[in-house]
Amino acid sequence: MAKCDKSLEAIDLDRAYTAPRKAKWAENKRINGLDTETSDGDIFCISVCWEGEKPMVQHNDREKLTSKQVWQVLTDHKARSSLNMWYNLDFDANVVLNHVCSEEQLAELVVSGTTLANSDRTYRQYMDTDKELRKGEYLITYIQSKFLEIKDHNSHIYTHYDASQFFYTSLENAVTEWLGESKANDGLEAGLFGSQTPNQLRETVAESDCVTWTNLSLTYNVSKGDKWTIHNAKSYISKNWSDILKYAQIDAELVRDLWQEAVNVGEELDIPMGRPFSTGYLAESYLDNRLREKPGLGPMPMAKMAWESYAGGRFEVLKRGNVGRVAGPDINSAYPAVLAELPDPKTLRWKRAKHASISEIETADYGFMTVKVSTDPTREIQPFAVKDEKQDKLVYPSPQNTEITVVKDIFIHAYNQGYVTDYEVIDCWLGYKTEGTTFPFDFIPELYDNRKTAEANGLEKRGLLLKIVLNSMYGKTCQTTPKRRELAESTELELHESYVPDMSLPKMIREKYSEGFIESLTAGAWFNPFLASYITGLTRLELHKQICKHDLEENTVMLATDCVMIEEKPFEESNFVENLVQDGLGYWDMEYKGDAFVLGAGVYQIDFDTCQKGCKDNCNKFSHKHKVKTRGFSEADLEKGLVNAAEKANGHIEIESTRPQTISEIIWSNEELSQVGNFLEQERKIKPEMDTKRKWSENTDFKKLLSTCETSLPLKI
């Protein structure tokens, strides 16, 4: 098995067989903006801007809000069946839920995604056999990073969404880009609403041996002559109360106006904006509205083989360290380009060919094969994705008599290019186009052209929403969602379900689920193994094909989804550059050229010769002349770049980050719920030997990598 550890039999496919849903438009829905202001995880005010009204604030005169006050805002009649938008709902939802729910309710919410809450925080189980809500009770559904939904005893629905995921930037930047306004804070520092660590505090204190900060009952020892800064959050809030209320109202109003503009732009483009759960759901809604019928899964044995062959995008580093001058060509909208040309698998003619010949496989239009294969271990870039069970990682090794399942196009390429030294076909499903074969996604080129036209004409908002739809379609074809339910006495497990015993659970969850619970994996509505495997498989294949075609295997530094990094001189001397087209769906384009320092997959720095933002020659902004990628880390944590951090590193690069703690992580790690919403300082490390997907020299350090380029060999499996 490649990318997914669950076989197709272990996935509930019911939703994949449903018809497209009716589009939900926003044109007749009220749009409201909301925001919380917190201190040490406690909510001291909620601001709300109802559509057509001036913003208001629910507060308790500088004190923590009561649960009743929170419920009043969340379930106001103006929030019913409305688009209630927040900016970074994850934070707000966590502090809100921790405010209004008991431990038992939160444990149930973390496990199942739903719980029954009420104004007095007492617990009553919501049974399948008794679904009637009582007055004062609310059925809560919360899916992290997606939405918070509340249902009351009158069956009124109040759904809250996260606007931030659609803008890819801060509220301040989004407001500037979309509304042409600035987000004025009147000198307020939101970070001061909560507790601060000593080096973040603001009021200078006199020299002393010891300072006691009574707000947290913490004592900090200070050496004589040092000056520390301290700050009492409660005091700061009290002194700046009127400004904070104004700040909160402005945020709520801006969020409302921001989403109103997004709705106006999106629905002009025929993108249904009425249920903005996520960027993926936006793409799903677009497909639901555009296509009358979903592509089918095709014959189930073929679909199982397709799922076995699915391996996602390719991230692999072949050279690391100071690799010198590089060129980085990439494919324009690679995944949408492949999807545009794929058929509905149920409209193909399929046949099983257990021991098919190479010629039979090659002449088929589509197909998947299980094969026992060996490849030439001296070749730098191997063609097949294999799960390394020891590392629990997807790697591209030199398989030796290894059984794999693969898209037939990838195997034929490897065979024709001389990679395959021995093979035995074990099973094969081959597909052929017929007169009735349909291509449901043939509208994608038009959508891509519309996006490019919008961007060229300065209509960046239209371009962004079209880009979201285009780039999010692929994810729907491989979407699976975990589901959990309580174990009942007479429960019989379905094939796609598994039992999670109580002894493996943390304390709060074990108290609620004393017998454990049942877990399953559910396919998304547009789940389709044929499409998922072919989209990613043909994209990986295109990278490899171009490298082989232009004899650049020994000069390739890195492969990353839809892009390759190649040593500049060999690249320029090849014919690859002739393939480059500035625009065009699925065509190659030049993303960058410059000096590269590479540590691992998605962790590198490119130094450009000139400013990439069109600034004057004296541009001194680091981000304009350098590209820093730190996959799995935040680029903001390396303001001066990866090279600078490596030069100062003592064995490893330390990256400190600060983020709010969530209910889920608190419960799963057996910590105190009082920590929810508090900001946790974390330290992560980037090590010089971070890449383990290939065979490297055993001893390396940053000093070596900064001065030399190291090469690698593929693993053997």
UniProtKB/Swiss-Prot annotation:
Entry keyword set: DNA replication, DNA-binding, DNA-directed DNA polymerase, Nucleotidyltransferase, Transferase, Viral DNA replication
Documented EC number(s): 2.7.7.7
Any single biological process term in GO: viral DNA genome replication
Source domain of life: Viruses
Keyword match Nucleotidyltransferase: yes
Catalytic activity: DNA(n) + a 2'-deoxyribonucleoside 5'-triphosphate = DNA(n+1) + diphosphate
Molecular function per GO: DNA binding; DNA-directed DNA polymerase activity; nucleotide binding
Function: Replicates viral genomic DNA.
Family: Belongs to the DNA polymerase type-B family.
Annotated protein name in UniProt: DNA polymerase
Organism: His1 virus (isolate Australia/Victoria)
